[in-house]
Amino acid sequence: MITFQIPSPFVECLEASRLLLERYNLKEAIIIPSHEESSSKEMRQAVALEGARYLQRTISDKDVIGVAWGRTMNHLIQVLNPCQKKDNTFVSMHGSIPHCQYNDVGSLVSRISMALGGQRFCFDTDALMRSKEELTRFLNMEENQKIAFLLKRISVSVSGVGSLYPELDSPLLNNNYLQQADIKALQAKGVYGDILLRFFDENGEECETDLKDRTLSIDFDTYRNIQTKIVVASGKQKAYTIRAVLRGELADVIILDYELAKQVIKISD
């Protein structure tokens, strides 16, 4: 008699995936083994590798792929297989962040389009405008209409997520993107995290501050209509943030390390 034994870490990951799929409205939950000796950068790279593999398995010719900024996204794009080119369109889902060269969405969209082939479209300006009126004027400019059109036709998106609860752990805070007054206003609204430069509360609903109306980014209603929203994250400190993402249906596919997944399950609804 032939028997097959799955190593224990993979059994735990499969069980965590099953529980998350059971409790939340997800298409897939991919959980990768965690190692106590692994650094946060190594775990970020590990989930990014799985994210790259999943993205390349998922996309088809003619897909419009939405791309976000971030450290995990930077690692994900580095490990894409350039032999698997398709006829896709890549579009930035938000504007740029000052002083953020390698992780910036413009750089990432250029690199992913070179790796996988296809056209690329980016907003060529900083994401945070001075006012709602300035943002409206920018979006109404003829040269930006194509990107605004494509945002409504994204079929697959991929992003990381920043954590702002229980600790302020988002890389956005390290890039002088927000003023101290902005951070206090977000905390007063119960901020839990950020995705696509938009800030959300414990239920995955956007925080109602003036940032909402002056941020150059896909709005949550349009984002939620994307058929396949892939969110890649690592680090158990993000558990409450990921729970908020799941409550708000801001992801269809999650790719997490086991320690993070275990914490999400522990606090899940």
Question: Across the structure, where does each feature detected by a protein language model lie?
Answer:
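Short Gly/Thr/Asp-enriched flexible loops that form oxyanion-binding sites at enzyme active sites
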Residues: T72-C83, D169-Q180
